[in-house]
Design a protein with these regions (language model features):
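Short alpha-helical segments enriched in small residues
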Residues: 1-107
Length: 107
């Protein structure tokens, strides 16, 4: 199944359930939001996204605890969960998806 088909399935499922979606992105720098919104019907369920490339932005906009980053690293499930929860709260959505990672030698 193609990425586009998977996104269409998600859009249809959330729309049928009257649910909404937001994103919190780091390493993908808005790429996930772009993929979602490139599919027809996304506006029915997609509310918005936050690109939080720097740790301070993850903390300020998404509520990620700096302790979580220092304890687990920025590339961790714990940070991704806090990012997703922060986006869900910021946009008042049912669901949120988060991506995290590092592009260089220094996290």
């Amino acid at each position: 199944m193609s990425t586009k088909n998977q996104i269409e399935e998600i859009i249809n499922l959330l729309n049928d359930r009257h649910e909404t979606l937001a994103t919190a992105e780091s390493i993908t720098a808005g790429g996930l939001s772009k993929e979602i919104t490139s599919v027809s019907g996304a506006s029915k369920i997609f509310v918005g996204g936050i690109t939080a490339y720097q740790n301070v932005i993850k903390e300020q906009l998404l509520g990620v605890e700096l302790e979580t980053i220092s304890k687990n690293s920025v590339v961790s499930e714990a940070v991704a969960l806090e990012m997703a929860n922060g986006a869900r709260k910021q946009f008042a959505t049912t669901w949120a998806i988060a991506t995290t990672g590092v592009a260089g030698p220094d996290p």
